[in-house]
Amino acid sequence: MKKIKVRYAPSPTGFLHIGNARTALFNYLFAKHNQGEFIIRIEDTDFSRNVKGGEASQLKNLRWLGIDWSEGPDIQGPFGPYRQSERLAIYQKYAQKLLDQGLAYKEFQENTTTFAIRFRVPTNQTFSFDDLIRGKLTFQSQEIEDWVIIKSNGYPSYNFAVVIDDHLMQISHIFRGEEHITNTPKQIMIYQTFQWHLPQFAHMTLILNDNKKKLSKRDANIMQFIEQYEKLGYLPQALFNFLSLLGFSPLSQTEILSPQELINLFDVARLNKAPAMFDTVKLDYLNNQHLRKLTPEVIASFIVQKKYLTLTTAPTNDKEWMTKFVSLFQDRMNYIQQIADFYQLFFQTKPSLSQEATIFLQTNPQTTLILKTFYNVFDVIVFKKDVIFNAIKQVANQNDFSKKTLFMALRIGTTCKMHGPSIALLLELLGKKQVLKNLSYVLKQAQKF
């Protein structure tokens, strides 16, 4: 059996896009599942679209996702160069072979010596291939005009260069978007003309936005680039997980899967024909689940490293405080940058009450006495979680307050919020000074009613 070898061949037009990342991932999963090779090739012959630093950005984003490769522009290999702009002589050689055989011809621009080279499409021929996802697809040659293989500037067209490169680099399988289906008959013509073995194609489903239209870079309500997710604190393994499920239904009891589990489960037979929906709610859920698998210490270190709390007054140099803080909110985080929102929500220096909290104070006359009781208790105790917990328990046991009213009054009085995480640890992290300040403020508001 021929060794499996796949490639991801981006243009260096900027950051790694969601759709391109999915393409890279499917090729990578297929290669790794079958103990094959995954390589990178850069298609950079359209200089008008190339972006400075675009290639480096693509490679950096791929590595962040956890994708590695055995050949590429950065590490080279036996079939290089791996940039199309460095392979022009190769394309010219094969174009000349077609000219010599009368299978291509020069098309001169009017009144100039400048010319393009067009491939002479054979008449009355059928071009078919067995798509690994869609089954047999067939095209007729009369549907296709003679097409340019070398442009007038000397650079190859996409459909010519990609065949030369894939053949010389011994690519066995090609996973790509369904928009490439119409390119395939032109590419088959080149394979057949040179009597080269045809690779196996798999054209992946479209990715749709929440309006069930093809995902576009113009979709302002969906972040389009991997780097954006990295900056917000999405985990690479979570994004790897999410993107792998866009058009793939693994035979698994859970959708929360590690990269290695996805490699083990990858099966071309379970790739979908129907379009895949880019569901940001599902992405947040998956990232939350992957975050829960990490220790608070790991997330705390990440927060400090990425400086997610630099715009707050959080004591980021206090590792113990940061770890406890993360443990409070870890299960609530969809992405790590949300930690700053949680901090601002609870650790505001100027207390204020929501309308919902104000209504509670108005409709529960016991609140004033409860707040006074807790103020007096908290004023004299050591402000550590266990001590705070026992103090709250003692107040609850020694007084005839309604438990529901007592605990809601406690939460509003100490945090100015109706809802939140474990109260004892939260109060320890807030500190006695801030807690008493909040209690004093809320008590004054309650006494107005």
Swiss-Prot record:
In chain numbering, where does the motif 'HIGH' region fall? Answer: 10-20
Q: Where is the motif named 'KMSKS' region mapped on this chain?
A: 214-218
| InterPro entries xref list | aa-tRNA-synth_I_cd-bd (IPR045462), aa-tRNA-synth_I_codon-bd_sub2 (IPR020751), aa-tRNA-synth_I_CS (IPR001412), aa_tRNA-synth_I_cd-bd_sf (IPR008925), Glu-tRNA-ligase_bac/mito (IPR004527), Glu/Gln-tRNA-synth (IPR000924), Glu/Gln-tRNA-synth_Ib_cat-dom (IPR020058), GluQ/Sye (IPR049940)
Q: Which GO terms describe its cellular component?
A: cytosol
Pfam families referenced in this protein's UniProt entry, alphabetically: Anticodon_2 (PF19269), tRNA-synt_1c (PF00749)
Q: Which SUPFAM superfamilies does this one have? A: An anticodon-binding domain of class I aminoacyl-tRNA synthetases, Nucleotidylyl transferase
Q: Name the protein family.
A: Belongs to the class-I aminoacyl-tRNA synthetase family. Glutamate--tRNA ligase type 1 subfamily.
Q: In UniProt terms, what function does this protein have?
A: Catalyzes the attachment of glutamate to tRNA(Glu) in a two-step reaction: glutamate is first activated by ATP to form Glu-AMP and then transferred to the acceptor end of tRNA(Glu).
Cross-referenced PANTHER family: GLUTAMATE--TRNA LIGASE, GLUTAMATE--TRNA LIGASE, MITOCHONDRIAL-RELATED
State the name under which the record lists this protein. Answer: Glutamate--tRNA ligase
Q: What is the lineage of its organism?
A: Bacteria, Bacillati, Mycoplasmatota, Mollicutes, Acholeplasmatales
